[in-house]
């Protein structure tokens, strides 16, 4: 398994689609900055900027992003007609798939760190009040952790829709709808704790300072595990 994972990391150098992931992380931050221009009475500071980046990542960007990249990586062996050669090594498709999914999990963390960097750069440019090193570290931890938990939330979709070349695009659409559904689930705390997409927020205590927000870590963990 270690060799499979190492090989998949070597292959990443050939995958230009990874730049699409970087671009989508930038888009998440730019979209957040765009919404900050709306005169809706919200008071923007660095903490609120971070919260909005996390929300946009959850609802519109990351589930679709990681499903696209994971599906592309998994389908390459079929698209390039190399799967039959790999299986003669012999390596089972199950082991190959597991190795690719592990790499995708690492990528979700890397994209979280990239998104965190873009968020801090945006803060430096715009200059919202309340920026502190400790808050920046907390923001990086939360953004990165939420990305990883979102990956776990869409993992079943990726695994089920990547069996055939090209079919992963169906998974991308499903993942987008699945992520967008988090916007509606977030309106009810019971549903938010049960819905895997919003459960990722509960795992990092998103807006836990708000008395109306009551996360149940046990329920959130079970939701993601199932």
Label each region the model flagged.
Residues 66-78, 83, 154-169, 224-226:
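Transmembrane alpha-helical segments in integral membrane proteins
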Residues 31-50, 172-226:
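Terminal transmembrane helical anchor/hairpin motif
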Residues 28-66, 98-163, 204-211:
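Secretory targeting signals
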């Amino acid at each position: 398994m270690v060799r499979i994972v190492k090989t998949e990391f070597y292959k990443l150098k050939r995958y230009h689609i990874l730049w699409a992931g970087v671009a989508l992380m930038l888009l998440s931050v730019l979209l957040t900055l765009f919404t900050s221009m709306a005169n809706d009475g919200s008071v923007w500071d660095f903490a609120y900027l971070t919260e909005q980046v996390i929300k946009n990542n959850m609802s519109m960007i990351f589930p679709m992003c990681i499903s696209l990249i994971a599906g592309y990586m998994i389908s390459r062996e079929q698209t390039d007609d190399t799967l039959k050669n790999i299986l003669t090594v012999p390596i089972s498709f199950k082991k190959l798939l597991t190795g690719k999914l592990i790499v995708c999990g690492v990528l979700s963390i890397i994209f979280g760190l990239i998104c965190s960097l873009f968020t801090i750069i945006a803060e430096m440019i715009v200059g919202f009040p309340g920026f502190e090193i400790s808050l920046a570290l907390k923001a990086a931890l939360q953004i990165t952790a939420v990305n990883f938990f979102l990956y776990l939330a869409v993992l079943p979709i990726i695994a089920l829709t990547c069996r055939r070349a090209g079919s992963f695009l169906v998974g991308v659409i499903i993942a987008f709808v699945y992520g967008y559904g988090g916007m509606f689930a977030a309106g009810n705390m019971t549903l938010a704790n049960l819905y895997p997409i919003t459960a990722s927020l509960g795992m990092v205590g998103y807006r836990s300072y708000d008395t109306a927000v009551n996360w149940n870590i046990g329920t959130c963990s079970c939701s993601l595990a199932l």
